[in-house]
């Protein structure tokens, strides 16, 4: 089960700006996303064109910083969601295609944390839940094929942005292996390079490039 928590994906200034835009616009019942959703979800969705345009522009700029790690082809538009008291999202699996892209990664970005309940959860193959309560500005990214949901909000209001990404790597196993390798690779320091030595570092880089040439296929 692949889950990555990115602490502080938004800094304090970005959080203020996003929340200011979030407050604007028109909120509608979240079931607008699909006719079958009424049975499983109970939330609100911001459908204001200008709000969606501004937030999408900002998110797509920020997401470019992750391209070295995740080999992303493209990202979907952002869903601007609100969960008020007692609102929730029952067990579900996201559609394999969303907004014209194949959904390989689901991304959930929290704009606040001053609420009770409302934990995002993911179920394993045994049906066991793992709960995630993100801090404001944190983002979680996980394999879209996993069963997940949102527990009822007990007090306050949960503000989130949700979007999906298409990987340039088709094979799920290779996708996760490359992410793990890339995260490790980009954390190497000058001391690590010195310890490896130039020749071994070149060999390591050659192996990485060959794997990417064979498995990473970016769209034009």
Question: How would you name each of these model-derived features?
Answer:
Residues 1-72, 177-220:
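Non-heme Fe(II)/2-oxoglutarate
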């Amino acid at each position: 089960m692949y889950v990555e928590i990115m602490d502080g994906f938004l800094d304090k200034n970005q959080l203020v700006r996003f929340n200011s835009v979030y407050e604007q616009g028109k909120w509608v019942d979240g079931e607008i996303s699909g006719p079958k959703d009424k049975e499983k979800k109970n939330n609100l969705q911001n459908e204001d064109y200008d709000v969606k345009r501004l937030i999408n522009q900002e998110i797509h700029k920020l997401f470019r910083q992750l391209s070295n790690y995740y080999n992303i082809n493209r990202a979907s538009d952002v869903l601007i969601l609100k969960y008020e008291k007692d609102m929730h999202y029952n067990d579900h699996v996201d559609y394999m295609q969303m907004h014209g892209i194949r959904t390989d990664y689901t991304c959930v970005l929290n704009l606040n944390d001053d609420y009770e309940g409302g934990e995002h959860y993911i179920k394993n193959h045994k049906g066991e839940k793992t709960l995630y309560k993100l801090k404001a500005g944190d983002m979680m990214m996980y394999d879209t094929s996993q069963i997940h949901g949102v527990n009822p909000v007990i007090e306050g209001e949960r503000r989130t942005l949700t979007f999906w990404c298409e990987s340039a790597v088709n094979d799920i196993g290779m996708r996760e292996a490359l992410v793990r390798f890339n995260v490790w690779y980009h954390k190497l320091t000058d001391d690590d390079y010195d310890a490896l030595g130039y020749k071994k570092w070149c060999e390591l880089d050659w192996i990485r490039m060959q794997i990417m040439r064979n498995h990473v296929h970016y769209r034009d």
